[in-house]
């Protein structure tokens, strides 16, 4: 299995160097490394040239934002799976890539560590639902995405901070792509890095995406459900199944009794 590791950078020389070290230090051999720099002026290009032998493709030129740069990286990728490890973010350990090779789903998602936190963040259950995504986005630093899926659902560049969330909605929820949640800690997330600058327009983008993809009544229902505790939702499912089961048993019993009476 071949991976394409893609790093987006703009004027984050120190963060870029940490990221590159974590990528080239992987013990898995079959991967390519792509760096898309947005025309940095802080010495980032010098860092890239320092590691040029380990980089498959790189470019430094102005772009139209992070998602434009990420799509640009995708266009140069040839791997089976893509992962975006943007400047400042790092692979958690040297064996991350080798630990994912047994999975074949369209999208594989692990965990991240935020800043100095010792508690992993990410999805903590096997499946994923629309409600889960209404509550939070999946960490792109921990997502391995099949290249054909990324090409089918490229990042929508009109959304400046939440296009990766739209990708998850379109691919997993609407497109019904196969999904695997794993307990592997994939990345150490730099809370001051390029991927952290998303709070300004997040809610604005999210509302616009929901309006674009779903009828208002569906959005309203799921917005309400997103604030209900998982345990309560699970209990409701069990209750519903119990009621249905009782009705089925009762109906079957009545049928048998009627059949016996006829005899």
Describe the function of each predicted region.
Residues 30-39, 59-62:
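Short beta-strand/loop segment that forms part of the nucleotide-sugar
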């Amino acid at each position: 299995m071949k991976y394409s590791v893609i790093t987006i950078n703009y004027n984050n020389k120190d963060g870029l160097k940490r990221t590159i070290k974590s990528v080239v230090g992987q013990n898995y051999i079959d991967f390519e490394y792509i760096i898309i720099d947005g025309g940095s002026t802080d010495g980032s290009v010098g860092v890239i040239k320092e590691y040029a032998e380990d980089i498959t493709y790189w470019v430094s030129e102005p772009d139209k934002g992070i998602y434009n740069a990420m799509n640009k990286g995708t266009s140069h990728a040839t791997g089976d799976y893509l992962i975006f490890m943007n400047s400042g973010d790092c692979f958690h350990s040297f064996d991350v890539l080798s630990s994912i090779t047994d999975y074949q789903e369209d999208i594989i998602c692990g965990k991240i560590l935020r800043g100095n936190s010792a508690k992993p963040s990410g999805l903590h259950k096997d499946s994923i639902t629309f409600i889960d995504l209404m509550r939070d986005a999946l960490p792109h630093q921990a997502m391995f995405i099949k290249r054909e899926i990324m090409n089918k659902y490229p990042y929508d560049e009109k959304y400046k901070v939440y296009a990766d969330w739209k990708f998850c909605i379109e691919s997993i929820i609407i497109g019904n792509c196969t999904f695997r949640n794993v307990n592997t800690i994939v990345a150490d997330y730099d809370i001051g890095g390029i991927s952290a600058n998303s709070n300004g327009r997040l809610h604005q983008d999210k509302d616009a995406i929901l309006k674009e993809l779903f009828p208002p009544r569906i959005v309203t229902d799921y917005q309400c459900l997103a604030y209900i505790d998982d345990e309560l939702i699970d209990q409701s499912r069990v209750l519903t199944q119990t009621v249905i089961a009782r009705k089925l048993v009762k109906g079957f019993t009545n049928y048998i009794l009627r059949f016996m009476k006829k005899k």
